[in-house]
Design a protein with these regions (language model features):
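Transmembrane beta-strand segments of Gram-negative outer membrane beta-barrel proteins
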Residues: 24-49, 73-77, 161, 299-301
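Membrane-embedded beta-strand positions of outer-membrane beta-barrel proteins
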Residues: 34-40, 77, 109-111, 154, ...
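Residues that define the transmembrane beta-barrel architecture of outer-membrane proteins
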Residues: 53-61, 91-96, 105, 146-150, ...
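Outer membrane beta-barrel
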Residues: 66-170, 190, 337
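Outer-membrane beta-barrel "beta-signal"
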Residues: 279-283, 327, 347-361
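Repeated loop/turn-to-beta-strand initiation elements of outer-membrane beta-barrel proteins
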Residues: 71-75, 106-109, 160-165, 192-199, ...
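Detector for outer-membrane/organellar transmembrane beta-barrel domains
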Residues: 28-34, 192-194, 216-305
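Transmembrane beta-strands of outer-membrane beta-barrel pores
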Residues: 40-48, 69, 79-85, 104-106, ...
Length: 361
């Protein structure tokens, strides 16, 4: 633990000094931004059915730094140092993103490790060929632990047309991701009659070719629909929508059906299962009530269901902000289904409760 802290503290100190007004020139041409987030979280698993500790603790330190020089050059990095204790203590430093970019007119060039989001789905994605793995029980990546891929990207905008070409490694400098291959991908985006649409073609080195398309359409201020269609050996389909009530509550619903092929199959799922069908429902509200003491609260409740084996998992999140620096939260999960023959029923606990606090500067 001490080794990781000693590595991160000088880095954070450098970020603070980078914006020292005494070291800045009289007429600065650059813009610097930085932040530091510290999270302490404790968790408890009730009804644990496997050997091991039922309680754990997580300490997470996340510094970010960004520098922009004029309208052309930019640099950004985001790190995550974590110390997890669950019976034993493990330490890790993750490089979430580190990249440099250059802009020349309508052309953007980027090189480095970066997080992309090409899929339009909230809890699932069929076309997010370069996206971090989507987790239906944590679609927002609440602890910000997702990592990007090392890549070179060229993006050119011509009117309402957007052309993006990407080459992504399977882990050029970092360790190779499980099952990842070098990927060459092309994305074409265009707005058609209010539909924000995109077509994507990609090829993995030594693997198969991927083709897909997605769309997003907003109607007024309350309704949004989205969909994805992808083909890699077989078809994967996603349909979803979001509706915002006058009370401020937001409802998100999605239906997702991936084939049971090597690319779409979750780790540990047998090949004999066949095509799967999932449902997702989320109800939430930010600023619970516009009253002192209430508007700092955010709550969400979600349900993920496997329609084939009847298993499901419920998720509840509640959080409260204090003076724009502190955020206390609760995260709970409760799976259900046949323990031996269902996806979510096989999760080895009856409930998981996590309570934490975050400080940001």
């Amino acid at each position: 633990m001490n080794v990781r802290v000693l590595i991160l503290v000088p880095l954070v100190g450098g970020l603070l000094l980078a914006d020292d007004p005494q070291s800045a020139p009289d007429k600065p041409t650059g813009e610097t931004r930085y932040s530091l987030t510290l999270t302490e979280e404790g968790s408890f698993a009730a009804g644990l059915r496997v050997p091991g500790a039922d309680a754990g603790n997580l300490l997470l330190l996340e510094p970010t730094f960004a520098y922009k020089y004029g309208d052309r050059w930019r640099f950004s990095t985001s790190l995550a140092g974590l110390v997890a204790t669950k019976g034993e203590t493990h330490e890790q430093v993750r490089v979430r993103e580190t990249y440099v970019g250059f802009t020349a007119g309508d052309l953007d060039l980027t090189a480095g490790k970066r997080i992309l989001r090409w899929g339009t789905g909230y809890a699932f994605t069929a076309t997010g060929i370069l996206d971090p793995p989507r987790v239906a029980t944590d679609p927002t990546d609440r602890l910000s632990l997702n990592e990007g891929r090392e890549m070179g990207e060229a993006d050119w905008v011509a009117g309402k047309h957007d052309f993006t070409f990407v080459w992504a490694s399977a882990g050029l400098l970092d360790t190779h991701r499980p099952g990842a291959r070098e990927t060459t991908a092309f994305r074409y985006g265009v707005m058609i009659n209010g539909f924000d649409t995109a077509a994507i073609v990609a090829h993995d080195r030594g693997g198969t070719t991927f083709a897909g398309a997605n769309f997003t359409r907003v109607f007024g201020e309350a309704v949004e629909i989205h969909g994805e269609l992808a083909w890699r050996e077989q078809a994967a389909v996603l349909l979803g929508g979001k509706y915002t009530l006058r009370s401020g509550f937001t409802v998100i619903a999605e239906f997702y059906t991936p084939p049971n092929t090597a690319y779409y199959r979750p780790i540990g799922m047998p090949a004999s299962v066949g095509r799967r069908h999932y449902g997702f429902l989320r109800v939430g509200k930010a600023h619970l009530r516009e009253l002192p003491g209430w508007k700092e609260w955010d709550i969400t409740a979600s349900l993920v269901s496997n329609f084939d084996d009847g298993s499901r998992i419920g998720v509840f999140d509640a959080g409260r902000r204090f003076r724009n620096r502190f955020h206390a939260y609760l995260h709970a999960q409760a799976p259900g289904g046949k323990r031996s023959r269902s996806e979510f029923g096989a999760i080895p606990y009856s409930a998981l409760l996590s309570i934490g606090v975050t400080f940001q500067m």
